[in-house]
């Protein structure tokens, strides 16, 4: 109904979980797996280890909410502690979904200090809270670099540049470096936020979520 439309929510996740003789692996990406998006630039992260179980649990919640049978997924989850494939590393992975994505982005930006650098590549950027956090980080002496899609095209149709042109104007007015992807009909479809501190430590947030409300 029209009354339900304001609460409409699509499943925007792009997740692949596979298994082989070495165990389970996961891919989280910004890419839509269809030919209409084949020219778009995207990003993805492939990983193993306990985080695969966290990802499966988040997908199981969606299945349960939809009334689907979760028996097969439950069996996979029960075997993951022994079967999850991981690479020995000091890196850590955390799976975040829904509003936790905004909270994590806000934390990454908000805790950046003078001498740190924030690199943001985003298909859609318009969330007021995050725009304010970016401007405040710049004022604290954080180097902020932003790469945006110009929002000119979508599947062969011309667009008006909303929302990125308005956001870029605001950020540029605050003194933040904003650059446009050099697209020719395709989309700069990546969604990533990278923070590097003065010691070379890095914190990366990526996936399918745009920074919009």
Name these PLM-found stretches.
Residues 1-23, 35-40, 46-53, 57-64, ...:
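PLD/PLD-like phosphodiesterase catalytic module centered on the HKD motif
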Residues 47-50, 61-104:
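Active-site cores of enzymes that catalyze phosphoryl transfer or operate on phosphate-rich substrates
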């Amino acid at each position: 109904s029209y009354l339900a439309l304001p609460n409409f929510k699509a499943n925007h996740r792009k997740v692949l979980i596979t298994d082989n003789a070495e165990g389970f692996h996961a891919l989280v990406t910004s890419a839509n797996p269809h030919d209409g998006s084949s020219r778009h630039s995207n990003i993805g992260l492939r990983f193993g280890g306990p985080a695969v179980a966290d990802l499966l649990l988040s997908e199981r919640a969606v299945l349960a909410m939809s009334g689907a049978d979760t028996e097969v997924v439950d069996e996979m989850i029960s075997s993951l502690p022994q079967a999850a494939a991981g690479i020995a590393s000091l890196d850590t992975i955390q799976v975040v979904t829904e509003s936790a994505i905004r909270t994590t982005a806000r934390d990454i930006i908000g805790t950046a200090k003078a001498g740190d650098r924030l690199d943001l590549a985003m298909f859609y950027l318009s969330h007021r809270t995050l725009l304010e956090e970016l401007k405040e980080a710049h004022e604290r002496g954080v180097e902020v670099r932003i790469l945006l899609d110009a929002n000119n095209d979508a599947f062969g149709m011309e667009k008006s540049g909303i929302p990125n042109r308005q956001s870029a104007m605001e950020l540029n007015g605050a003194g933040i470096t904003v650059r446009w992807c050099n697209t020719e009909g395709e989309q700069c479809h990546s969604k990533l936020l990278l923070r590097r501190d003065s010691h070379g430590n890095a914190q990366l947030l990526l996936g399918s979520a745009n920074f919009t409300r």
